[in-house]
Amino acid sequence: MVKQKEILTAQNKRNPKGKGFTTLLESVFRARIKKVQEELSAHKLDALFVFSDEYRPGYTLYFSDYFPVNVIEESPQGVFIPKEGEVTLFLGGINAKTAEGISWISDIRSVENLEDFFAAKNYQHGRKIRAGLDGEAIMPVKYSKRLEP
């Protein structure tokens, strides 16, 4: 029989930073990112941009462990996963502030800065990056236009 103390200890170790909507270990999310990065390399892509919104947050929740607070603002959201390196979480302004205490991702930015972010990535690579896009069907035109060349 498992002791109560052992159960509590296991629960506290789920997320070593004490963050997260799902209470899954940060290592679970890092493993998901690593798998995507391996696929990006295999398909010769520089990155994947995953888009969700406040009504269908599943894509970004899967990678970021953040569930948006949709009663305070519209919450377009995205996760930028580069072939190598750390991921970036994009949220609406109020949700971006809230996510700092919840998501395991440390680089959290306003979704309104997508265009500048991608321009900087293009500059760093010396060319337009080759990025996959997930969630395109639910992405508002104003955001998809910011990702156009």
Locate each region found by the language model.
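Non-catalytic accessory segments adjacent to catalytic cores
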Residues: 113-149
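N-terminal accessory/capping or targeting/presequence segment of soluble
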Residues: 2-120
